[in-house]
């Protein structure tokens, strides 16, 4: 009887398992239907280097061009004369600001343009107490929501805040305040060595008027000033990990002099900075340990230790999401011979700038391979592109970039020009889908992701987006199949876990009732059998 009972239980379990398999079949048919009729290429502008993204194995997968180079402008074409050295570019409220400097006063400029790169204002200096003061070495630039223009000057080691008076060519800059270099009188953590090293380079200003400066030759972190322009410390300095032995020695053995010699921070050099719409700071690092970065590429998992870009909160903690197929470090192929065909591009991407876009996206500029990488909020690479090669007028030494709506602007120090890229229909569809997802409009996002697949049937993030939509709708069967198509293990595990819960919930009561029925039937049969035996014995 026990053997019969065990067989019945196993039979019921097998039926449940087969139910899971049967449930997956309609989902596979839905996924196949969504790819049916999709094309792998569309009629878009071509470039010398194919645009691409990465799959879960770290392979480059070509995708439609997300941006097209539509204009390239230098100082002469702009009507401001030859720009000897372009430095930085920043977009705000439909206007583009560019800084340039050189060996003479006329080379030092702050240029304002409209979105189409038409000249609006050409400033060669500012007004202080009614007197004109020429720029010396303008470098980084930032514009606040109120229209205040902040500029760093590497010759005076200062940050200047300007108010704009007038409009167009007649507009002039009036100095509102000057934030000088930190001094030994400002804080005990500032010494003469720091004062000599400090050269302000790039900056951002938050909504409370706190100023964050990336300074050349400063490896203590990002230099911060309060709303009054007073030195306020360092943000996001490198963390020191003290081993247990050193902790013991510091607590019980070391003298005060020996304790002071223990490093309090790991030297870290930032080279650029930007502010997102939520007020968080994005910063790029001038260098990182190549061995660590390579290890993270192989592991396909990024950490703060191998980061080339960070998202910092006001405490200096890195909160950047790195959930993509590869870490957000630019090119994952250390020697990208397939894309570049040039051994001079060997090595890690050299990230020189970061620009925050809409809906949590951000773009990184690599001046090693001259590529631009655009990521979403979770750290997935949306696409990488470069446009024409150098021989066709493309960028040779890109140094800065910024975004304004559907446009990306990049500065090239070699040609002393600004490059203007416009989104293609493919990128517009991707960004629209991301926007709808951020707004919680999953059904509408699903329609747009299907449109993305019409441009590129191999675009994994479209399947991921469709899978998320199905997941949030509770359609775990379809979601698991879509996540399987894009090889996303994390989301596939989530969907499969929910699917298993759903199936078990549906079959739980039938299983329990079946087992109880078997037990009751067994008990009844046993009673009947015993009664029959007693009757036979009485007879």
Task: Label each region the model flagged.
Residues 77-88, 134-141, 191-206, 248-278, ...:
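Signature of short aromatic-glycine-proline-rich micro-motifs recurring in repeat-based ectodomains
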Residues 74-108, 285:
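Beta-strand-rich domains and repeat architectures in extracellular enzymes and scaffolds
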Residues 223, 283-308, 359:
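Short, conserved, GDST-rich strand-edge loop motifs in beta-rich repeat architectures
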């Amino acid at each position: 009887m026990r053997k019969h009972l065990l067989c019945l239980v196993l039979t019921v379990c097998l039926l449940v398992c087969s139910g899971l398999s049967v449930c997956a079949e309609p989902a596979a048919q839905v996924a196949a239907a969504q790819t049916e009729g999709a094309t792998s290429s569309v009629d878009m502008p071509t470039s010398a280097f194919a645009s691409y993204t990465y799959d879960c194995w770290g392979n480059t997968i070509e995708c439609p061009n997300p941006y097209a180079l539509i204009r390239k402008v230098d100082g002469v074409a702009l009507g401001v004369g030859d720009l000897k050295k372009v430095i930085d570019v920043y977009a705000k409220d439909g206007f583009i600001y560019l800084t340039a400097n050189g060996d003479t006063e006329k080379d030092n400029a702050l240029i304002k343009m409209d979105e189409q790169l038409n000249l609006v204002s050409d400033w060669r200096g500012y007004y202080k107490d009614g007197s004109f003061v020429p720029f010396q070495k303008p470098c980084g630039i930032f514009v606040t929501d109120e229209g205040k223009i902040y500029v760093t000057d590497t010759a005076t080691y200062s940050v200047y805040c300007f108010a704009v008076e007038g409009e167009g060519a007649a507009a002039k800059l009036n100095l509102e305040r000057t934030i000088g270099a930190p001094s030994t009188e400002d804080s005990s953590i500032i010494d003469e060595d720091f004062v000599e090293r400090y050269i302000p380079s790039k900056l951002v200003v938050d909504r409370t008027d706190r100023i964050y400066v990336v300074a050349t030759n400063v490896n203590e972190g990002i230099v911060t000033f309060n709303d009054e322009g007073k030195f306020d410390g360092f943000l996001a300095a490198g963390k020191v990990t003290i081993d247990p032995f050193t902790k013991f020695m510091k607590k019980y053995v070391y003298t005060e002099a020996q304790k002071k010699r223990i490093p309090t921070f790991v030297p870290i050099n930032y080279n650029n900075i930007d502010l997102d719409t939520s007020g968080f700071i994005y910063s790029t690092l001038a260098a990182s340990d190549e061995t660590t970065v390579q290890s993270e590429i192989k592991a396909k998992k990024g950490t703060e230790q191998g980061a080339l870009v960070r998202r910092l909160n006001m405490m200096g903690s890195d909160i950047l999401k790195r959930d993509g197929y590869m870490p957000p470090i630019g090119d994952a192929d250390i020697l990208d011979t397939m894309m570049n065909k040039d051994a001079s591009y060997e090595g890690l991407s050299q990230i020189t700038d970061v620009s925050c876009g809409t809906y949590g996206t951000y773009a990184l500029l690599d001046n090693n391979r001259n590529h631009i990488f655009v990521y979403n909020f979770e750290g997935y690479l949306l696409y990488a592109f470069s446009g024409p090669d150098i021989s066709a007028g493309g960028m040779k030494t890109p140094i800065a970039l910024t975004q304004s709506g559907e446009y990306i602007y990049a500065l090239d120090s070699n040609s002393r020009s600004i490059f203007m890229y416009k989104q293609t229909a493919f990128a517009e569809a991707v960004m629209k889908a991301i926007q709808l997802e951020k707004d919680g409009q999953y059904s509408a996002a699903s329609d747009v992701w299907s449109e993305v697949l019409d441009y590129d049937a191999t675009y994994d993030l479209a399947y991921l987006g469709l899978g998320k939509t199905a997941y949030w709708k509770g359609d775990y069967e379809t979601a698991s199949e879509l996540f399987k198509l894009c090889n996303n293990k994390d989301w596939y595990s989530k969907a499969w876990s929910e699917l298993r819960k759903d199936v078990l919930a549906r079959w739980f009561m039938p299983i329990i009732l079946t087992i109880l029925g078997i037990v009751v039937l067994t008990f009844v049969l046993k009673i009947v059998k015993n009664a029959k035996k007693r009757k036979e014995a009485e007879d």
